[in-house]
Amino acid sequence: MTPVTEPPPTLRERFRGTLLGVAVGDALGTPLEFELPGSFVPITDMIGGGRFHLQPGQWTDDTSLALCLAESLIERNGFDPVDQLTRYCQGGRLGGRQPRR
């Protein structure tokens, strides 16, 4: 029997996976941001807290800015600095692009 192979991911799926990785890594690392290596117990779950007192799974402005950039690149079909800056400013006024529960 020949093994079934999955088709390679599309470019869209790869972009989506990248942004998901950014958000998950940001949410996992936020509680330890600015901490010195070895000064904390390693985490194995979404714990929240940290200097920003975020809820478990909540990301920071790093992810919000990455989402603004991705939206701008997609909707403008390339780099548009005015659109990108506008999105950054609107995101700040609207409380950023925080996860919805």
Question: What do these predicted ranges mean?
Answer:
Residues 1-101:
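Structured, active/binding-site neighborhoods that engage oxygen-rich ligands
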